[in-house]
Design a protein with these regions (language model features):
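FIC/Doc superfamily catalytic core
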Residues: 1-141
């Protein structure tokens, strides 16, 4: 029964004190096995993982197309009780890739912030510079 299974899953998850990435992955695998929706379970489940990572200050991750076959194999292995490590390793690989992308974006954002600050400073200096004839109120002849 889907409602009972979801209630049990949520109760178990919410009872945990210190959520780690393995707990989020475990929740995801169980959520996907319950399959609460007619369509979109995978997208919803991966979105929940992303949100839970952010909520618990864990670097989130996205399963890209290159990792999809490993993700599906890992999910199958996890849900059938064969092994949990394959899915966990796939998610950790995705997390490493996401971190690498973010680390490349942060310096670009800093550079953009520095440029914006420099432009604001230059603009402020330019508008207060009254030595230019057009700014001093004296007409240019």
């Amino acid at each position: 029964d889907v409602p009972k299974s979801m209630q049990q899953l949520l109760s178990e998850y919410l009872a945990k004190q210190d959520i780690k990435i393995e707990d989020i992955i475990d929740f995801h695998a169980k959520f996907e096995k319950i399959h609460p929706f007619q369509d979109g379970n995978g997208r919803v489940g991966r979105l929940i993982m992303f949100k839970e990572c952010l909520h618990h200050n864990i670097t989130p991750f996205i399963i890209d197309m290159n990792l999809q076959p490993y993700y599906y194999r890992g999910l199958w292995n996890y849900q059938t009780g064969q092994e949990k490590g394959y899915l966990v390793d796939t998610c950790l690989t995705a997390q490493d890739r996401y971190s690498a992308i973010c680390s490349r974006l942060v310096p670009k954002q800093r550079m953009a912030d520095q440029l914006a600050t420099a432009q604001e400073k230059a603009s402020a200096e330019h508008t207060t510079d009254r030595s230019h004839p057009e700014r001093s109120g004296n007409p240019v002849l």
